[in-house]
Amino acid sequence: MKDVMLSTRAKAAVRLALDEDLADVADARKSKWCDATSEALVDPEAIATGEIYAKGAGCVVAGATVAKAVMKTVDPKIKVTILKPDGSVVKPQEPILVFRGKARSILAAERTALNFMQRMCATATLAKKFVDATKPYGTLILDTRKTTPGLRVFEKYAVTCGGGTNHRMGMYDRVLMKDNHRRLWKGGDPDELDQAVVAARKKFPKLAVEVEVESLRECASALKAKPEWIMLDNMSVADMKKCVRMCKGISKTEASGGITLDRAKEVAACGVTAISLGCLTHSAGSVDLSLEWRAV
């Protein structure tokens, strides 16, 4: 699991989030960061030790390195120790990370650090539930592009912290022909999907090609060109099983379309290679995290 903070996009997003909280909205570039409350009430030389922990059970840690980066961006002298690395499952009130430094700096970074972590932990925790539910079948749990604008790198990283697997990062790293593409290809003829695969490979020979299908007929058409993946969209269990048999030895299969945790095991039992889930990044919610002082 590669540290998300190695990404230049992640570093830029952390800076933007801090600007949002600490810089004058009129001109963030020229504005000095300011936490007015702390500057008014807290001794500038006061040193404090604090910790972040989850209040509920079963939280999967994600974003500990992000919280550390937030703290260090505000004040490089803050000492941060990660006690529970990303991917760990923690008990209620079990410290995830501990930090020591100027109290003003910690207070300035607090909310931004928690905002990142509480959402990332929620995504990781939900991903783990799906991974655990489908574990007997070895089914991959994939995310989607249904992410918060500007925060995709964090949300997709959080999925991996919960044991999930990243689907394509964007529209540039895989050809994925969905329903709206199909309608624009050869007048939407379901028997011409193989030719769409051929055209995609000709244009982007190094990229994997995936075709979304909604029927056995469309699946059979696409399979003639042997795409790397077939996405089975909103299919019944019976049709999914048939498509899996058709695709065996030719293409990997991905089940998609509003699959809930209650249905995940049944879908996995169909033999699909993977299940993709928009809910991991658009509906996971947030985990209740708290930052508390250990010593002031």
Report each predicted region and the residues it spans.
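Short secondary-structure boundary segments
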Residues: 234, 257, 279-280
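Acidic/glycine-rich phosphate/pyrophosphate-binding loops and surrounding catalytic core
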Residues: 1-225, 229, 241-246, 252-254, ...
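Short, structured secondary-structure boundary patches
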Residues: 233, 252-255, 295-296
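Nucleotide-binding motor/catalytic cores of P-loop/tubulin-like NTPases across gene-expression machines
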Residues: 236-240
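Short, charged, intrinsically disordered terminal tails
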Residues: 279-296
